[in-house]
């Protein structure tokens, strides 16, 4: 193998479409844009959601509800993710240290998803009924 013999695999680099280069090319004159109209012009794009002057769907539908700011600082933690935490006491700080949750999270809830094999103590976190049963079945406990 030599540098001057290197070439890309056949068909891996298709030649780009050359538009407006004569009738024989099949893409001459109008260049695949058809005749007249906004889309035939340069810069003739229609913004996303524009419906030709008709009231767009986004504006026809009513505003509804809001995004709770508390949800932005709340996280769900799966049972299977508790295994990533070193030590047997699990609280908000230990979850952050193990990169299970991000540093801006202020509230966390343990949910039943996956399995837990080791006995752990969950401190200061909310826990679902199913997760509580699974933690206690593994020999762990929940403290408020």
Swiss-Prot record:
Gene3D superfamilies in UniProt: 3.100.10.10
Cross-referenced InterPro entries: Ribosomal_uL15, Ribosomal_uL15/eL18, Ribosomal_uL15/eL18_sf, Ribosomal_uL15_bac-type, Ribosomal_uL15_CS
Residue stretches of biased makeup (Gly residues): 21-31
Keyword 4Fe-4S: no
PROSITE patterns per UniProt: RIBOSOMAL_L15 (PS00475)
Basic residues biased stretches: 32-44
Keyword annotations of the record: Ribonucleoprotein, Ribosomal protein, RNA-binding, rRNA-binding
Signal peptide: none
GO cellular component: cytosolic large ribosomal subunit
Nuclease in keyword set: no
Binding partners and assembly: Part of the 50S ribosomal subunit.
Family per record: Belongs to the universal ribosomal protein uL15 family.
Protein task: Binds to the 23S rRNA.
Name listed for the protein in its UniProt record: Large ribosomal subunit protein uL15
């Amino acid at each position: 193998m030599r540098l001057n013999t290197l070439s890309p695999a056949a068909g891996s680099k298709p030649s780009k479409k050359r538009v407006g280069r004569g009738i024989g090319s099949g893409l001459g004159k109008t260049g695949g844009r058809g005749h007249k109209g906004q889309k035939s012009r340069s810069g003739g794009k229609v913004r996303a959601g524009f419906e030709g002057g008709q009231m767009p769907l986004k504006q026809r539908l009513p505003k509804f509800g809001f995004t709770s700011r508390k949800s932005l600082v709340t996280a769900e933690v799966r049972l299977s993710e508790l295994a990533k935490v070193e030590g047997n006491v699990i609280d908000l700080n230990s979850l952050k240290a193990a990169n299970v949750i991000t540093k801006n999270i202020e509230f966390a809830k343990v949910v039943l998803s996956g399995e837990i094999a080791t006995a752990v103590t969950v401190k200061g976190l909310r826990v679902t009924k199913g997760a509580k049963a699974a933690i206690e079945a593994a020999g762990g406990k929940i403290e408020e």
